[in-house]
């Protein structure tokens, strides 16, 4: 969680979020909101935005006080919206916050090794997503592939969400989802 523009007089804070699933509502964050309200004593109202840049802009403009960002977006928010980290999500049974990035293909795909993605159609989540854009690009760079190099992929596109990225593979619009 990241905060900006907080003060002691305010009792209701606005939390900006980018939907984490196709449902597209704050139910993805219900537990987080309840815990934050309980621990701080503040009321939390939510603001839904469609992308990470809009979340940062809401905080920069003072329309939001709290946000749930990935690592890449946090760096931007810290620079332009004075965001400060005050909590991190940790999965049950794990010691540290971290990211998992998966490259997904169909079960019957001929892609058996990571290097086989060269020349294929790649779908990613959204621009600015740490787990669905930045980390996949880092992993591709480790095997000397770049989404910016037209010779490396037949096509690269942003599907718009994790769910949409997976659906692109299932619907044969993409060979691999990162």
Q: Across the structure, where does each feature detected by a protein language model lie?
A:
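N-terminal, post-signal-peptide region of Sec/Tat-exported proteins
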Residues: 30-70
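Acidic/His-rich segments in extracytoplasmic proteins that coordinate ligands and/or metal ions
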Residues: 71-77
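Structural recognition of the beta-strand scaffold that forms the well-ordered cores
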Residues: 46-48, 66-68, 87, 123, ...
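Short helices/loops that flank or line small-molecule/ion binding pockets
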Residues: 53-67, 80-81, 115, 161-178
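Ligand-binding "clamshell"
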Residues: 77-90
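Bilobed "Venus flytrap"/periplasmic-binding protein-like clamshell domains
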Residues: 10-11, 15-37, 49, 72, ...
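Sec/Tat signal peptide C-region and signal peptidase I cleavage site
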Residues: 2-9
């Amino acid at each position: 969680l990241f905060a900006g523009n907080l003060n002691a007089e305010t009792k209701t804070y606005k939390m900006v979020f980018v939907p984490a699933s196709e449902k597209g509502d704050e139910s993805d964050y219900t537990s987080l909101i309840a815990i934050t309200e309980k621990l701080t004593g503040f009321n939390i109202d939510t603001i839904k935005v469609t992308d990470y840049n809009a979340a940062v802009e809401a905080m920069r403009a003072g329309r939001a006080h709290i946000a749930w960002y990935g690592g890449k977006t946090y760096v931007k928010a810290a620079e332009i919206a004075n965001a400060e980290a005050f909590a991190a999500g940790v999965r049950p049974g794990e010691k540290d916050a971290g990211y998992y990035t998966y490259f997904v293909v169909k079960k019957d795909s001929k892609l058996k090794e990571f290097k086989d993605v060269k020349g294929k159609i790649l779908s990613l989540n959204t621009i600015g997503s740490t787990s669905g854009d930045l980390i996949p690009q880092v992993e591709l760079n480790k095997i000397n592939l770049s989404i910016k190099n037209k010779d490396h992929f037949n096509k690269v596109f942003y599907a718009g969400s994790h769910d949409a990225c997976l659906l692109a593979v299932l619907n044969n619009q993409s060979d691999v989802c990162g």
